Amino acid sequence: TLYRRKSTMARKMKTMDGNTAAAHVSYAFTEVATIYPITPSSPMADYTDQWATQGRKNIFGNTVKLVELESEGGASGAFHGSLAAGALTTTYTASQGLLLMIPNMYKVAGELLPGVIDVSARALASHALSIFGDHQDIYACRQTGFAMLCSNSVQEVMDLGAVAHLAAIEGRVPFLHFFDGFRTSHEIQKVEVWDYEDLKEMCDMDAVAAFKKRALNPEHPVLHGSAQNPDIFFQVREACNPYYDAIPDLVEKYMNMVNAKIGTDYKPFNYVGAPDAEKVIIAMGSVCETIDETIDYMLAKGEKVGAIKVHLYRPFSAKHLLAVMPKSVKTISVIDRTKEPGSIGEPLYLDVVAALKGTEFESVKVLNGRYGLGSKNTTPADIFAIFANEDKAGFTVGIVDDVTNTSLPRIETANTAPAGTTSCKFWGLGADGTVGANKNSIKIIGDHTPMYAQAYFDYDSKKSGGVTTSHLRFGKTPIKSTYLIDKADFVACHCPAYMNKYDMVQDVKDGGTFLLNCEWSPEEVGNHIPGQAKRYMAEHNVKFYIIDGIKLGKEIGLGGRINTVLQSAFFKLANIIPEDEAIQYMKEKALASYAKKGDDVVQMNYQAIERGANEVVEVPVPAEWKDCKDEVLGEQAVSGKPEVLDFVNNIQKPINACQGDKLPVSTFKNVIDGTFPQGTAAYEKRGVAVDVPCWNSEGCLQCNQCAYVCPHAVIRPVVMNEEEKNNAPAGMKVTPMTGMPGYYFTMTVSVLDCTGCGSCTNVCPGNNRNDVLKMASLETQMDEQKFFEYGLTVSDKPEVLEKFKKGTVKGSQFVQPLLEFSGACAGCGETPYAKLITQICGDRMLIANATGCSSIWAGSSPSTPYTVNKAGKGPAWGNSLFEDNAEFGFGMKLAQDANRAALKNKLDEILASTDNADVKAAIDEYYATYEDGEANAKATD
């Protein structure tokens, strides 16, 4: 459609993601890299560091000097200093990290220093944090004086990244080169790669020499950054105008140099579509690829549509925009990937409106819309809706806004991807290796066949054990489908528990293939999958296969790492490349990956590859499955506070069923400011562990060390009196309590919340003599769940705490943990400490949580693991930023001090005016315990 003409030079093809492409290009022009990691930009700095360590040379014949600072603010300060002293400098960042760089960006731009910031554009924290992609961060920089260049795909990151550096060097204006976080930064594509010699040929070495000559140097000293007074500041600020006026033409010049080398047609603004288009979309970022694909489909139907892809956003060149605008246009829709509350329109829209003013296009209708916030999936159906929209301004796509009615309804249609595109979708469990295996698969196919390949990985925010879906596409032409796969030729479910949680078989196209990893035989499997899945397979001629990856992994010695087994099964069934070739390529990858770990590990992976291909079993799909009825996936929560139940049933459960995209805006009317109820993680019951602890009362020392170290608070001691013991469910193991005559002890396990880490069995001292705690298959331990639930109903025993003391390892575990079932990794080392604190003083805690790992396992929507006790008290949790947590917490303390002081003043007034002895006694007790938190809490009950 747009760019690729016959190339005038051959470049190597490699399979890589956008971050790798950006790092490859930036390394060529970089002498110093000052960095601080932040998702999703971190891999760019990682690759730069790795290549420098390996001795890779830039185009100047030197290795890059990379330094990690204490924060993005520090990285930007060093970025400024390095440029000022004459080194071509690059940094990599996103989101909050980019915001911390803004003060230095003004300085760098004001001093006309040719630095480059590569940004994997990401949402900013507002009502909630989002690590996912949109343009909020880069728009916050549009006033800094940096030129801003956008790449819409992995290939464009490779191609246009060079333009940012080349134009910065000659033009003396720093560049912010950005591309969409995750959708481009982490999307893997087969791309053409620059050779550094070709980049060197385009670089203006005289401009490099001039830059170094202007640098701070005691051999020819100058002063940068003086303080100026009102008499001259304004004039000097305006004196830089010629440099900015020259940038659009300079960018065009270097784009033309790139075009001449590689046969492309890059421009500051690129038009695609009908030459006589009447409807035009203007956008920038990865959505342009989806728009391009959709336009191809619509042109084949004879529709007069087109799109303008923005590459050079700052300086915004009206001349270059107007040069590509079709004269026939009647309606322009400008879509922004950001939200500016209170503005008359988002930034790109306002720029376009201003650019059209006073031109032949001034009377053309210009509509504005928002899309894609926080990586919201934007599909061809949304693009059809935008083209169909005649009048609605301020619209949104990709959501249902039933509150302010901004949304356009999607217009579903046929598959817009080019004929011959094969799509595959994999449902995995976070940290089970599925994503890594699919990265290998895409690289095998991309690097060893002439096919184009694309891979994108969709995650939830759990640190591990969450849902991951891998989206792979293969085809004979470049793949522009920058949206999630809806219907796939091949679907695999790597976690059998998902079958009763998610509608995933419905992802398979008619006649497609479904692979299930499970321990069930072909005869049994039909008893374990829901009716709607069976009916869909029968009605849509789906080929059904199973493999017991868990059993194979254990037999081979790989444990729960089933990724290699299932990768081999995929190549066996998908018919993308010959099976024998795939096996050979997989073995080569295994050797390269594991050779350092010894031949035994390599041979185990070879076995996994061979057996994965050989032990796939086809399951006949009987005709009677067409008569199967729908089954409910996930039960409604029925116990708890009304506001919690409302949240769990109407928000949490749909999100956890991967149906969150379907929730309308009105669903969130009670949580618009990001306030969520505590304790909702307890309603998930994910059942993701393969093996869970099995407690044997004989030989148990009742030391509670297992509960003490449990990262997810799933194993808990319970003390019962005689009546509670007698009322316990049949089969519950109970033993007399040591040191407490008349009381009974049991250890309960919430097997559906367990992650199977084995920390409890590792620490158990009783295992030295007996199998007090051992790991057993989840399916054999399902009765333990009702025992755990019963344990939650027994009465508190203050006398037990009096005996064993809350300040001891044993005694602390008789207190309800107010952190439970978090999204932390199996075996996490952080959560046991946080859990313990809640057992000591959780009912009167305010938590200021810095952004990072602990904020993700503690506050990832929609599951909140901090919970409340039977009195409804528990930790109140808040998050501000990564860099200000001490101050944020200090602010909480100041508020508490102020509120308590105000209360004390009110009590002083009451005390002075009352004769009620009970009131006076209560106030006196409050005063007497004022500095003792626990005692004061009791005084206020």
Predicted regions mapped to residue ranges:
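Thiamine diphosphate
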Residues: 252-400, 471-473, 484, 488-490, ...
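Conserved thiamine diphosphate
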Residues: 131-181, 205, 358-372, 539-546, ...
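Structural signature of the thiamine diphosphate
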Residues: 148-210, 365, 375-411, 604-626
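A short, small-residue-rich loop immediately preceding and capping a beta-strand
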Residues: 32-35, 64-67, 82-100, 114-119, ...
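Active-site cofactor/cluster-binding pocket
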Residues: 12-18, 315-316, 331, 335-346, ...
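Conformationally flexible catalytic loops at phosphate/diphosphate-handling active centers
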Residues: 60-64, 175-270, 631
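Anionic-ligand anchoring segments at beta-strand to alpha-helix junctions in alpha/beta enzyme folds, i.e.
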Residues: 32-68, 261, 275-276, 280-311, ...
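Ferredoxin-type iron-sulfur electron-transfer modules and their immediate structural context
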Residues: 582-583, 595-754, 761-846, 850-940
